């Protein structure tokens, strides 16, 4: 009986971060998108557009601001547009009425309340531009020549590899798959 119910999708858990589920909620999503433990405003999902090659990690995207609901009887609403090749870091909050351009990194904990131009790395609350995306990537490529680089996927590392990594990263950072 359980297998029948699972086939009918009655007992299957709902993955609220699956691209398939979010598309059904009206969110426009490009290709190669990873949404990890994030909250996307499903009440106005049709106002969210996400480009291709985007990663969203433990972030919140809000298309509405209910601060005016009780005094005015209405919530403020606005679109959220996210370009291509974007990384949104842990605990970032994207507020309504904002556009994030292409080739952008939004740092962890960042609050995005205004548009972010293409080719930007932003940090802070409120968000501010730290540097250009291409400069950031160039700097990180240079660091890969002087820092430890680990070629085994983190979930496939042996205990010995984990210990080696632990020791090598005592006072520095490195790069992992």
Residue locations for each model-derived region?
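Domain-scale signature associated with acetyltransferase and cell-envelope carbohydrate enzymes
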Residues: 1-85, 92-94, 102, 118, ...
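Hydrophobic alpha-helical segments of small multi-pass membrane proteins
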Residues: 78, 108-111, 121
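Short-chain dehydrogenase/reductase
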Residues: 87, 105, 121-122
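Beta-rich strand-turn-strand
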Residues: 92-105, 110-114
């Amino acid at each position: 009986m359980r297998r029948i119910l699972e086939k009918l999708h009655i007992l299957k858990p709902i993955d609220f971060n699956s691209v398939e589920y979010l598309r059904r909620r009206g969110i426009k999503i490009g290709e190669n998108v990873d949404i990890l433990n994030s909250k996307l405003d499903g009440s106005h999902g049709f106002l969210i557009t996400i480009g291709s090659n985007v990663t969203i990690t433990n972030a919140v995207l809000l298309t509405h601001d209910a601060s005016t609901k009780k005094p005015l009887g209405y919530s403020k609403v606005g679109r959220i547009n996210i370009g291509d090749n974007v990384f949104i870091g842990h605990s970032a909050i994207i507020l309504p009425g904002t556009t994030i351009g292409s080739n952008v990194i939004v740092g962890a904990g960042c609050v995005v309340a205004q548009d972010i131009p293409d080719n930007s790395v932003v940090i802070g609350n409120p968000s501010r531009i730290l540097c250009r995306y291409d400069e950031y990537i160039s700097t990180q490529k240079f660091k890969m020549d002087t820092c430890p680089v680990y070629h085994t996927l983190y979930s496939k590392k042996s205990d010995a590899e984990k210990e080696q990594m632990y020791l090598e990263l005592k006072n520095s950072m490195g790069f992992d798959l």
